[in-house]
Amino acid sequence: MHLAFVIDPDRLVQDGAALQRLAVALVSDGVRVRRVLPAARDDAPLSRLIPASTYDFDGSPLFRASRLGTLSSELEEDRPDAFVSFGARAFEAAAELARDLDAGLVAMVSSARELDATPLRRHADRLDLVGASTGPVALRAARQVGDELATVLPLGVATPDGGRTPPPPAEGIAIAGPGRDDGAYRAVFSAIASLMPSMPDLQVAIELPAGHDPGLWALARELRVQRVLNGVTSLESIRPLALACGVMALPEAVGGTRSIVLEAMAMGRCVVAMEDAMADHLIDGVTALVAGERDARVWGSLLSAGLRNPEVASRIGAEASVRTAARFGSARCAAQLAQACETVVRGPAIPFPGAAASDA
């Protein structure tokens, strides 16, 4: 079987490491993989062994057909059996290529926001399957494309080896999120301010991606927490440091999954998150500490428990690690994707559990 992964810039930044592991796992199992990537990228050594083509996702729409035509001609010589898209913009390109080369089409979706931005209905006649990262996202997809075309099919992440203990957590917080909800960040910053007097070494890494609220720094100055904040464009750019933090905080709902959060859970880190109806893997008191409201006292209590209560943090982290490995382990997810694509390419019937199925 020959698969083409079409990966747009947003998903490459967010899930680059997970996608690399997925491709390597599939190749090691005898699946041929070609990647279609943004022109500017920095491949890891193992990824360089996997064939790649480039596509300008950010180019002018006027020349889009020409760019796709050139890519289609390149792929014609070694035609993939199916295109697997990662990201809304990638799906558009994958759908056109699948139509042109008469190949299967699978959309991998990590969040409700990404799902809503993906033009599934426009290419419904070509679409074979939507693989959603969680049960609620799969149910949402099923309302667009039908139950028979939506299933739970997450992108896996690395999990610690059985004999290796993750390094002990540092006295730090990694804040993941788009930085757009002023009320959510006010609650979190206020909670951090309440911790600072008793935690003089506390450091916080905070994402400030494109489109974040420019007033966040003013808010940080107002609440006097700016001296402990360290802004980065993405936690992925400082992955080792982010995963070393004792707590990963999600002030805003992710609306599904995010690889670096799953990696933190797999390592036994304590996740403190805003309530998220699309994230069925974040179970309050079991795999995470979940805040039901944007309240500084609530967040202060949860962050304090994650950083200063070893019994709570270790219990949550241990359960999160076990469940994340069982549900989102990269080897398991690679095997699921291979089986799904094999069915798309060869099958007549699709023996998928459907959108209603989700592991606890």
For each feature predicted by the language model, list its residue ranges:
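Short alpha-helical donor nucleotide-sugar binding micro-motif in glycosyltransferases
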Residues: 233-235, 240-245
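Acidic donor-binding loop of glycosyltransferase active sites
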Residues: 243-256, 269
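Nucleotide-activated donor-binding/catalytic signature segment of Leloir-type glycosyltransferases, i.e.
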Residues: 214-234
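Short His-centered aromatic/hydrophobic patch
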Residues: 85-90, 109
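A short, active-site helix/loop in glycosyltransferases that binds the activated sugar's phosphate group
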Residues: 120, 124-150, 159
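Short hydrophobic beta-strand element within catalytic cores of glycosyltransferases
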Residues: 270-274
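A short, well-ordered alpha-helix in the C-terminal region of glycosyltransferases
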Residues: 305, 312-327, 333
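Conserved acidic donor-binding segment of nucleotide-sugar-dependent glycosyltransferases
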Residues: 284-285, 289-296, 305-311
